[in-house]
């Protein structure tokens, strides 16, 4: 697959398998701080209220941001990696994960984030595409090439701890609403 095809594939996999369940609300291409020098766009943003039966349940909801990255070059392109949620994930392929894993272990990725994306949260994890019948550990050793003729799932290979959010709930919900979907 080309880079564009991989990005489209991962985005569809995310929306089909992770977003939109009962009580979950999401939007794509969410613009944050538009018309300012700090304008950013998040590939996908999800809001999950604690419950939908009370005001406090809604107010206790959390935002999860997802950035789709097709390869290591895409990760370091300077585009994306805009993390404004309590939880944030890079959604990628196993090949890309294997390519960036040494950078995570050495601290290179954290340094890159501090330098190039200082407004982004430091709370992030990684999800990779894995065949439905497979396990992430098996795929790490022998990745299956991406193809549309196979059933896939997203598996968390680097969990994200829940962190703090620097944008208000009202602002992020408005940004999601403005994006349309």
What is each residue range found by the language model?
Residues 1-12, 28, 65, 70, ...:
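Accessory alpha/beta interaction modules
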Residues 2-26, 34-38, 105-181:
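Non-catalytic C-terminal interaction segments of nucleic acid-processing enzymes
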Residues 21, 60, 83-85, 121:
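Short, well-ordered coil/turn elements that cap or connect secondary structure elements
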Residues 31, 45, 69:
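Anionic group-transfer/hydrolysis microenvironments
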Residues 37-65, 79-83:
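Active-site beta-strand-loop-beta-strand hairpin of nuclease catalytic cores
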Residues 45-53, 94-105, 130-133:
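Short regulatory "switch" loops immediately downstream of catalytic or recognition motifs
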Residues 66, 89, 125-127:
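Hydrophobic/aromatic beta-strand patches that form the interior of the parallel beta-sheet core
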Residues 69-117:
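Short, charged, amphipathic alpha-helix that recurs within catalytic cores of restriction-modification
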